[in-house]
């Protein structure tokens, strides 16, 4: 399907600041289909985690979208793929008790209203397992795609296409005024690690609740989308508290 040319750049969302991140994809045909979905909707930054090189089947299914594949970047882990981005939106088919999950429409609206100049990652997981808890913990926001109750999940390429098409086509104003950018994900993660370390030293986090509390903390601080000013304040507070404990 060819999209109307005149509608391609009228929504003001700045497609160049969005990256599609595929974590641990297995089927290279799906990677090619994702590239095609990106080219159809005007997005070009594809990041692959856990993939060393693309196989021929990826190029076979890309169909006139080979440039997206040729420019794709490869990362050894999710932290490396997201460290320079400001906000991460992760798609999941399962509702998790420890992660606040947004409806798709809310996620799209939040994406469109993200601060001008912020770099945003759209994170999608492995075809069989989806995103693991550790991967969801690297996101600021987690969302689900609407689907019939009897169908457990979308194909990877379909999930990417639905998300990108919603960003591409739905009307809505661009951000009307400059906002403070969130800190990069690398800086946000450093802050979260300090908070978790303090909670562990205080005894609040222990062996029995470590996974649950850690996921709750990551979900909370992710949704706050800490700015550099927020991060510096929290780091100062928690680092000072840690230093006092050492004395």
Please annotate each region the language model reported.
Residues 1-247:
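Post-transcriptional modification and biogenesis factors for structured RNAs
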